[in-house]
Amino acid sequence: RRAPVIATWGTAVLFGAYALGSAVSAPDVLTSALLGRGDDQASVAGTAAVLMDHPPMLAGALSFVIGHLVGMVLVAIAVVRAKVVPWWVGLIIAVAQPVHVVSAVVVPNRLLDVVLGWGATTVGYALVAGAVLRTADEEWDLQPQPR
């Protein structure tokens, strides 16, 4: 209601990112299937490398990573600007995904990712969901408020 443009952009970016998320997991699925049927590890590794280095796969994976990072930050800004939650909830959501990228890719640390990456994202969105559930029926479908 109070931040429809940024909320729409955040949602669209996240949708696009998660739609391309299969580009991240496809090599894992392929590797598992080929090893499961008995292919040798060297040829499976070579095939997976070819798949991961293929331009559409690289573009999809990169779009997923950048999109879910940017989309989460946009949604965090939107829920704060719309006054759905306090600023610190938006900060939790906005910071959680950069922490996830660092803890999952740059400095692999599963505990950091679970607690401050996806864990913080979960807590932030749970707080947003709680606020939405507490919103009175008459507050829905109102015209945007002027700034």
Describe these PLM feature segments.
Residues R1-R147:
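Hydrophobic, aromatic-enriched alpha-helical segments typical of multi-pass transmembrane helices
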